[in-house]
Amino acid sequence: MLKKIKLMRDSVEDWKAYPFSIPAISSLEELVLRSRICFFAGENGTGKSTLLEAIAVHYGFGREGGTRSFMNDSTDSNRSVDPLVCALRLSFDKRTGAGYFLRAESFFNTVSYMDELDKEEAPHSTPISAFYGGRSLHTRSHCETFFKPLELKFQRNGLFLLDEPEAALSPQKQLAFLVLIHDVLKKYKDAQFIISTHSPVLLGYPKAQIVSFDDGPLHEIEYEETAPMQIVRRFVNERETFLEELFDDPPSLFKDDF
């Protein structure tokens, strides 16, 4: 199990260059993982996906996702994390070498890459699709394309890294995902999840460690302190008042996004 993520600060050549220009990354010294499920929470651009990708590459996953034996580095989209990869030290009490890395933004590229490889393979070789339910994931619905690998690849010990998996999961499927995580953690004592997410549903997993990337240095927070939970709670409990205030005076954060 991954226990510590440490930034070897002497290895950083330029603190002004990306990704060290991100406050949460530049302030990182040592992050101790005390739970088998840890969530990275924070607004877009705060570094949660950047750190997750760096951990994945350091561990040996392909940059676009998949298992360690499936190295899809077909694009250069995230090579910018390399300086962080080189400066990280990961400490394990037990390292299985197994696991899965899912990047929501590039997963469909990965599926296309798998289909291309299947077309190129020798006639008697086992197609990659055989390990994903027997047919191309592109033949499934958008939600199934994401969920089927989770169902199939999580049935083992290992390190499972997921970057915003809620992007393709309905609220009902997010609940099903929580059940899947619960079953895996119960069945496999050396299974571990690190998940970058905005989902108030996923963040609500019992006794999970939540690390916030907002407001500077990394720090742990409780579920009730997460922005997604607070926003949804107020929206549900005070919808009309909340929307009136929002429309009358949109926060500067939203204006910047537009």
Task: Locate each region found by the language model.
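Conserved P-loop NTPase mechanochemical-coupling segment
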Residues: 111-140
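Phosphate-binding glycine-rich loops of NTP-binding sites
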Residues: 35-69, 196
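GG-anchored amphipathic helix commonly corresponding to the ABC/SMC/Rad50 NBD signature/C-loop
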Residues: 132, 140-164, 171-187
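Flexible phosphate/Mg2+-sensing switch loops adjacent to catalytic phosphate-binding sites
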Residues: 61-91
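Nucleotide-state sensing region of NTPase/ATPase domains
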Residues: 79-116
